[in-house]
Amino acid sequence: MKIEQIYTGCLAQGAYYITSGGEAAIIDPLRETQPYIERLKKDGVQLKYIFETHFHADFVSGHLDLSRKTNASIVYGPTAQTEFDAIIAEDQQIFEIGDVKIKVLHTPGHTLESSCYLLIDESGNETALFSGDTLFLGDVGRPDLAQKSADMTQNELAGLLYESLYHKILPLADEITVYPAHGAGSACGKNMQKETLDTLGNQKKTNYALNQKDKESFIKEVTDGLLPPPAYFGMNVMMNKKGYDSFDEVLSQGLQPLVPEQFEEIAEVSGALILDVRSNGRFAEGFIPQSVNIGLDGDFAPWVGALIVDVNQPILLVTEKGEEEEAVTRLSRVGFDKVLGFLEGGFDAWKKSGKETDAVHRISPEQFEKEIHQKEVKIIDIRRESEYNAEHIHEAYSKPLAYINEWLHTIEPEEHFYMHCGSGYRSTMAASILQARGYRNFTEIEGGFRAISLTSIPKSDFVCQTKILK
């Protein structure tokens, strides 16, 4: 028997590859199937089952393409309703993979169909729990995402989650290894640890949600402080339920090279968003007017989903050479399949063709320090609220990037302001969106709060240990 965790850091997502006796199972695969196909060929095994822990909201799963290519059966937990062929398992149902077994544990709460998969090894021992979004390390699945489809309140769903965890998961043996669907950085929870596997025994001791005195306390704790989910979550659920275009077709279309003249014409005719995925430093130096920057070198896919409102938005890509396929792939993981092509030769080709360019006005933290001592200034901090609360510049306003589509309308076009994030990754995103919407009355601070913290600019007292995120 072999268990392999295939962890994708930029999505904070874990898929699982299990083999035994010439057969295999994959749990919660990502959109692109090639990594799994390669493993199956290398190991000389037949994929028998594709297990889904629930209808994912934060990414589009690869279950359909993988099933088409391997003839493996797709398995969901009880109550799931799909528009494609799938086994809708019963609670406690057993599936055999070679010499091992997987038992379905129906654990509603995060969603109604949410299920965990308990692995029973060749000796009959319960050894691993693939817990999906029911149980994370340090947290549990948020109970607010399925309110509409379940016709239940988040408190009612949280009550179901309590029953699932306390009656089905906690009685399991301490030595069982927990393999969750997500880790720190995912929007599917609020308090996840950076580790990607742990023993159930340790989680029983350390996970706040597993140590509540009663159901009421549990409901209060798990619903407190939940931020609104990204807009793309609902569409991803629908794609996972109903189906989607083949990833191979999406990739083929997205990898169409376009010379500057073609690129410009298609942008005008289609109304495509020009998405520049270069680093924030490269983008700030020069870019195509109206383009939006979300760098591949950060949490690319989640920010795409948070900032681009419509998953059906046509997209044209500007990339560094050789990063075209990576960009199309990562867009498809969150359901953005309408990539029309990429700028052949990148931004350099655009410049050489003599076409109009733009740039972001940036200054160093040292220059910023001089300027704030010379005049009264307005400062906008676009980090997450938790980062702002931990430590921030005196008099800075908190306006998180995730909500820029709401707060940018409150900006006075004639009032100048300075803007920063944690490192420069997010503030350049914000700068690109602001300039695309016609706002030019701001200055971005290079290096973000990390760099600012090295100056003598007055700051609030440090309140708690907070990871400064990109």
Describe each PLM feature range.
Residues 29-30, 55, 79, 111, ...:
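Active-site metal-binding loops of divalent metal-dependent hydrolases
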Residues 2-6, 16-19, 95-124, 128-129, ...:
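Core dinuclear metal-dependent hydrolase active-site scaffold
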Residues 33-75:
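Active-site metal-binding motif and surrounding structural segment of the metallo-beta-lactamase
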Residues 26-27, 47-56, 74-79, 106-109, ...:
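Active-site neighborhood of phospho(di)ester-bond hydrolases with catalytic His/Asp-centered motifs
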Residues 101, 111-228:
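Metallo-beta-lactamase
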Residues 18, 28, 54, 66, ...:
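Divalent metal-coordination and catalytic microenvironments
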Residues 142-143, 155, 202-238, 242-244, ...:
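Rhodanese-like catalytic fold shared by cysteine-dependent sulfurtransferases
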Residues 1-46, 117-132, 137-138:
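Conserved beta-strand hairpin/beta-sheet module of binuclear metal-dependent hydrolase folds
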